[in-house]
Amino acid sequence: MKVDKIDKQILAILQKDGRVSASNIATELEISIPTVTDRIKKLQDSGIIKGIHAVLDPKPLGLDVAAIITLISESSFHYKEVTEAAEKMPEVLQCLTTTGKGSHMLFIVTRNSASLEDLLRTIQSWPGVQRTE
């Protein structure tokens, strides 16, 4: 799918507020509501819009510790396994493959320092993970 200026404007609006109505988008961009809904559907069908998610404040949920964990792998052989393991953990908000010193960076939230230690032990037991930093 070719993304044009209008599509990019719609995406920018949705990134700020995923719950904004098609009517409000249409008014802001001075286009019709059916045009907005058709374009959003095409953006979803093409996979450009993968979903609309709530951004949560972790503290009221009892998640008081946020951390960035760098994983040092034995080799690139385990990259896929590490990524798949990270995606299964609810504490992991994001898993990035990196170059340089580490193989992956994990952005996590957890309850407290004790649960962080438990999480680190779990991650260090994954195949190919040499250590965490």
Where are these regions (language model features)?
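A compositional/biophysical signature of low hydrophobicity enriched in polar/charged and small residues
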Residues: 1-133
